[in-house]
């Protein structure tokens, strides 16, 4: 999984042509919607030109989350195009990819798998002060899912199955706070 994430980071940086980081464009951020679901997260948004930025947010579920016996880890990557005069302070649209690995127990079955939501998003960053912003965004796209399911039959035997699924769904919901460092 770490190798896949490394490859994704390299590809994103190559595709979007990071040549220099702008002096006034580094922000530390967190998604409050994630915290509300007991998924602590921290991220960074880095301006790569006068009207674009890249972001990375790491999510890790809490030990006992809202879904009993659930555990997941995700790393969201994104590219944003800012329509205002300066990045990190206006309307934006972008693309996101969020590779994730999860393990959960639902009723009598255990599910373990990987998923990859790929989508487009739109949002707005509201400045509260020179350094502090509130950010709201929503994204839709495709969700690719592969999971192994282990359950117990009525006879008490362990039954294993695998499932691949592709669906159109929301890919991210963000109500976040960001603090501009530079």
Feature map (PLM): residue ranges:
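Sec/Tat signal peptide C-region and signal peptidase I cleavage site
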Residues: 17-23
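Extracytoplasmic loops and strand-loop junctions of Gram-negative outer membrane beta-barrel proteins
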Residues: 25-27, 103-107, 156-162
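Short, surface-exposed coil-to-beta transition loops
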Residues: 38-41, 119
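Gram-negative (and chloroplast) outer-membrane scaffold detector with strong preference
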Residues: 46-136, 174-182
């Amino acid at each position: 999984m770490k190798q896949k994430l490394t490859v994704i980071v390299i590809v994103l940086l190559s595709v979007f042509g990071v040549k220099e980081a702008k002096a006034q464009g580094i922000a530390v951020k967190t998604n409050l919607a994630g915290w509300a679901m007991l998924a602590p997260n921290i991220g960074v948004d880095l301006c790569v030109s006068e009207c674009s930025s890249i972001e990375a947010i790491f999510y890790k579920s809490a030990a006992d989350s809202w879904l009993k016996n659930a555990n997941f880890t995700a790393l969201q990557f994104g590219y944003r195009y800012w329509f205002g005069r300066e990045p990190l302070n206006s309307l934006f649209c972008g693309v996101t990819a969020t590779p994730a690995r999860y393990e959960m127990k639902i009723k009598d079955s255990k599910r373990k798998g990987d998923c990859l939501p790929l989508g487009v998003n739109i949002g707005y960053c509201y400045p509260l002060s020179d350094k502090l912003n509130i950010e709201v965004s929503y994204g839709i796209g495709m969700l690719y899912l592969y999971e192994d399911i282990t359950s117990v039959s009525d006879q008490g035997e362990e039954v294993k199955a695998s499932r691949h699924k592709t669906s159109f769904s929301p890919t991210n919901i963000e109500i976040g706070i960001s603090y501009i460092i530079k």
